[in-house]
């Protein structure tokens, strides 16, 4: 097992970028490994730097979080395009937004009142968000230390054993998660999970992106496309009603590109419920489990683009509506209202409580799998 420090990442960038190396290297304000080194619950925590020669990512095994992600704009200038914190204690003490850069689960998104039933057994998980369960409860999979299984220059594999009854969920759940920076400038996330008891699983990834760079302005001019003809509408508590709502003629129709801010202020009950965009899009796809591109984002000032591909059936789009500038990110800039977006591939929220939604039940003889790919390029 080999850990790659900042100096090695810079060297790799020099090798990969030729004449642009000095500009690229000097532009990267990488986080310091020593600011992320600790022992928590008897496990070592550290910071790992990955690179494919063009993009560079830093990951901590506390919560399996992406701390920074550097990509070039159309002129080759590098920016860190994800929100994060500069020190481990910001994550451990939950100072600010809890889910920055994290995998979320066991069940991503919301469970109505934190209640569900399996084979006649009723379960209650923590109501950690306005009377409902959000992203796995009080600890989830983001407030624990993952074990490092494998590290390479461009990839890291983390594993987690979530015990039976943890946060109220049944079954011993074993999760393997791999982050890879591919030669095609993709950030690929893969999950595999198994259980020894019938349970529910719906994992997702929760990086907050700003293609201008962290703290560099609003995402309302980012241009978004989503391959989806329906959303799952919610009540005022952001719990799905169980229906599908066609996007035709609504602010939720992103089948053709639209600036995020173009219709975000429309007089629509769903936008009011979420304070902006914060809902689940049902993806237009064949039910064959293949990985396909389902969304794209374009930032016109820098030319940065991000495609999202997945094998999942749905995606949550959140437009950073609840940030208020109270807390600063990695570089001292306030994390402000609508200065980031999340695109979270998943199955439908609260699926366990809606018979018509795709199943999130995992049995002992099954393997849960999930692929999400964020691809970066410019135009």
Residues covered by each model-derived region:
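Positively charged n-region of N-terminal signal peptides that target proteins for export
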Residues: 1-4
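Sec-dependent N-terminal signal peptides
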Residues: 6-10
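C-terminal motif of bacterial Sec signal peptides marking the signal peptidase cleavage site
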Residues: 14-16
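An exposed, glycine/acidic-rich loop-and-rim segment of catalytic or binding clefts
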Residues: 18-379
């Amino acid at each position: 097992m080999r850990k790659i420090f900042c100096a090695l990442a810079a060297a790799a960038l020099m090798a990969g970028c030729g004449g642009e190396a000095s500009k690229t290297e000097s532009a990267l304000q990488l986080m310091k490994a020593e600011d992320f080194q600790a022992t928590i619950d008897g496990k070592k925590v550290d910071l790992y730097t990955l690179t494919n020669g063009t993009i560079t990512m830093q990951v901590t095994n506390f919560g399996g979080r992406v701390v920074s992600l550097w990509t070039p704009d159309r002129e080759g200038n590098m920016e860190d395009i994800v929100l994060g914190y500069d020190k481990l204690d910001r994550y451990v003490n939950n100072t600010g937004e809890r889910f920055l850069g994290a995998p979320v689960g066991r069940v991503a998104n919301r469970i109505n009142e934190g209640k569900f039933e399996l084979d006649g057994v009723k379960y209650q998980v923590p109501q950690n968000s306005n009377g409902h369960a959000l992203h796995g409860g009080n600890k989830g999979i983001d407030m624990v230390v993952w074990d490092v299984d494998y590290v390479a220059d461009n990839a890291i594999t983390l594993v987690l054993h979530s015990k039976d009854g943890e946060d109220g969920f049944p079954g011993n759940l074993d999760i393997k998660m791999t982050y890879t920076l591919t030669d095609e400038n993709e950030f690929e996330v893969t999950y595999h999970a198994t259980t020894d008891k019938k349970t529910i699983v719906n994992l997702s990834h929760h990086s907050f992106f700003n293609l201008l760079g962290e703290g560099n302005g609003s995402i309302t001019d980012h241009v978004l496309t989503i391959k989806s003809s329906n959303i799952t509408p919610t009540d005022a508590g952001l719990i799905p009603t169980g229906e599908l709502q066609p996007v035709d003629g609504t602010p939720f129709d992103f089948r053709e590109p639209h600036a995020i801010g173009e219709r975000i202020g429309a007089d629509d009950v769903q936008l009011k419920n979420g304070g902006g965009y914060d809902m689940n899009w049902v993806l237009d796809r064949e039910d064959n489990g293949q990985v396909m591109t389902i969304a794209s984002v374009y930032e016109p000032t820098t030319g940065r683009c991000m495609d999202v591909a997945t094998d999942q059936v749905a995606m949550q789009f959140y437009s950073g509506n609840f940030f208020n500038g109270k807390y600063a990110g990695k570089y001292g800039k306030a994390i402000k209202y609508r200065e980031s977006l999340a695109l979270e591939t998943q199955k439908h929220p609260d699926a366990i409580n809606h018979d018509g939604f795709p199943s999130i039940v995992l049995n002992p003889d099954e393997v849960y799998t999930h692929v999400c790919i964020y691809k970066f390029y410019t135009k």
